[in-house]
Amino acid sequence: MAAFAAYERALVANDVAALDRFFLASPTTIRYGVAENLYGHAEIAAFRAARSPQGLARTLERTVITTFGRDFAIAATLFRRATAPGKLGRQMQSWVRTADGWRVAAAHVSIVEEPRAT
């Protein structure tokens, strides 16, 4: 999904205006982050505007995009950051196609300790 790749580029570049456009402009849009629970596009935009642009580079792993029909998709990925050794990030997004293009309607981001190899 091209929109997911474009979102990722905007995220690591801290392109706040683009990130704001990627989230559905609705009071029902939700983003559960590592340390914040954001309800509505306005809260998500305020979080993005205040966030430090440092340390956003990351490497994606095991990205899976599953579509349901032509207008709904789930994007799930793992990520790692050089600034957080021993940690594994997880991100899941619900995408909906609107008249303006694909938008994130709900997102969840969490970070866990790196699983030990067995």
Show where each model-derived region lies.
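Short, aromatic-enriched amphipathic alpha-helices that serve as compact interaction elements
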Residues: 1-14
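Hydrophobic pocket/interface hotspot
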Residues: 7, 19-20, 40, 44, ...
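Second-shell loop/turn segments in exported
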Residues: 8-9, 33-35
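Short, well-ordered alpha-helical segments enriched in acidic and aromatic residues
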Residues: 13-28
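A mature extracytoplasmic/lumenal domain signature
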Residues: 23, 35, 78-79, 93, ...
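Surface-exposed, charged secondary-structure patches
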Residues: 34, 42-87
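Short, surface-exposed beta-strand-loop junctions and turns on beta-sheet-rich folds
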Residues: 38, 81-82, 110-111
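Short beta-strand edge/turn micro-motifs at domain boundaries
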Residues: 88-117
